[in-house]
Amino acid sequence: MKISIKDIFQKPELFYQKKILLNGWVRNCRYQKKLIFIDLNDGTFLENLQIVCKEIKNIETADINEFQENQKFNNNNKSSNNINLEKLKEILQIGASLQVEGILKATNNLKTPFEISAQNISLLGTSDFSYPLQPKKHSKVFLRQISHLRVRTKLFGAVFRIRNTAFFALHSFFQKKGFFHINTPIITPNDGEGVGELFQITTLNLEVLPQTKNIPNAFKPVNENTSKKGIDYKKDFFGKKVFLTVTGQLEAEAMALGLNKVYTFGPTFRSEKSNTTRHAAEFWMLEPEMAFCDLSQNLKVAQEMLQFVISKCLEQNYQDIEFLDKTEKNGLIEELQNIAEEKEFLTVKYEQALEILQKSNTKFENPLFYGVDLATEHEKYLTEKHFKKPVFIVDWPKEIKAFYMKNNPDQKTVAAMDLLFPRVGELIGGSQREENLSVLIEKMNQMKISQKDLEWYLDLRRFGGCIHSGFGLGFERLLIFLTGLDNIRDVIAFPRTYHNLVF
């Protein structure tokens, strides 16, 4: 029977003394006079499975070409037991892919309680001494240079198995809560976040376009069909300037005001020229939107979602997280368990958080005054030194938040929330949306946001508008917290960052 290494480690008693077939890659090999030990890994589990190869002399040995073709016989169950140690040594290299047929046997060794006694080994893919992942510790900086191979290491195998679990746990949470999954556009004329850091896309001939220094903010009152350099975008594919999306929120709002509760989960893009450990040009965002939902309910959904995902990862990837606890972030398991069991995340107002920071007697690089957005150093102080746990910051000054956020009765703040996490800083940003049409138009005018491309968005208030709320979760930032790593480049398989696009 063909099984995975994960199957064996989870329930070895089901396979003892049975003939099994498995595939994998050589992580290491050790040679003795009459034995060869192979550490095999197929990517399904953290640990390697030990394969023990003994000389079998009852048949004529095969040459290397026949040895490589042995796969055909294995698949047809026509092969005799065939292991020649000398031939095996000639072709066995770290990184090679193998098919192994043998018997699972128990051992008296606590570190390797079981092993495969090999009867047949087929070489599926060769490797050589230039293979960069030799059995030694490699730095993460080095491994980023070989992103196409780093998933074969113990560290990155663990990271991307956790990523898989977290991804589907998010879907599972919202499906169980009665949300509908929707797909929002990748190509958009709008800057939903108002950040202005957009990737513009065009089918015009770039060889004859004049060079421009900046991409205009799509919300600024400029002519959408021409640029300051005289480029006629009426001749472009869409007849106007368009960009890669920075958020699916606006479209998700439209869908929520018909389906009640929706979420979108996909890639977003930001042309921020930053080389920090927290920023990437392409990243994944999860964005739920809920009709008939106020800010307090919004906070509750965010907390329940995160606790569900953390619990699922602890349940399904405990060995991976345990490995990361030992190698990357001491105390990771305890930290995750504490947050998963937290009754209610702390909630403080922006003014309260600002006062805590100002009274901290800590010298921050970024100044503190009412109306300033909190910097990473401020977020980490609050979560790691003061509260020492996650905290919602609510009721932010309206001047530093987006136009669509609902004004509070004081008319100075908006019903916005940022969820700050230890080690990560801002993990979630969201708000109750402004449902009052006249107030929304007034805010757009104050922020000099053109209504022309957003008449459809205003229609959501004209026709059956209601209170509604939502938030955005930076998926990679969640993964940084789940894995104990400290760089966004290490939780994305093929990261796209400023001046870095190789794979």
Swiss-Prot record:
Name of the protein in question: Asparagine--tRNA ligase
Subunit structure: Homodimer.
UniProt KW Protein transport keyword: no
Superkingdom field: Bacteria
Family classification: Belongs to the class-II aminoacyl-tRNA synthetase family.
GO cellular component: cytoplasm
InterPro entries assigned: Aa-tRNA-synt_II (IPR004364), aa-tRNA-synth_II (IPR006195), aa-tRNA-synth_II/BPL/LPL (IPR045864), Asn-tRNA-ligase (IPR004522), Asp/Asn-tRNA-synth_IIb (IPR002312), NA-bd_OB-fold (IPR012340), NA-bd_OB_tRNA (IPR004365)
The protein's Enzyme Commission number: 6.1.1.22
Alphabetical GO biological process terms: asparaginyl-tRNA aminoacylation
CDD domains with a match to the protein in the record: AsxRS_core, EcAsnRS_like_N
SUPFAM superfamilies linked: Class II aaRS and biotin synthetases, Nucleic acid-binding proteins
Molecular function, one GO term: asparagine-tRNA ligase activity
Catalytic reaction annotation: tRNA(Asn) + L-asparagine + ATP = L-asparaginyl-tRNA(Asn) + AMP + diphosphate + H(+)
Extent of the signal sequence: none
Keyword annotations from UniProtKB, A to Z: Aminoacyl-tRNA synthetase, ATP-binding, Cytoplasm, Ligase, Nucleotide-binding, Protein biosynthesis
Listed Pfam families: tRNA-synt_2, tRNA_anti-codon
Subcellular locations according to the entry: Cytoplasm
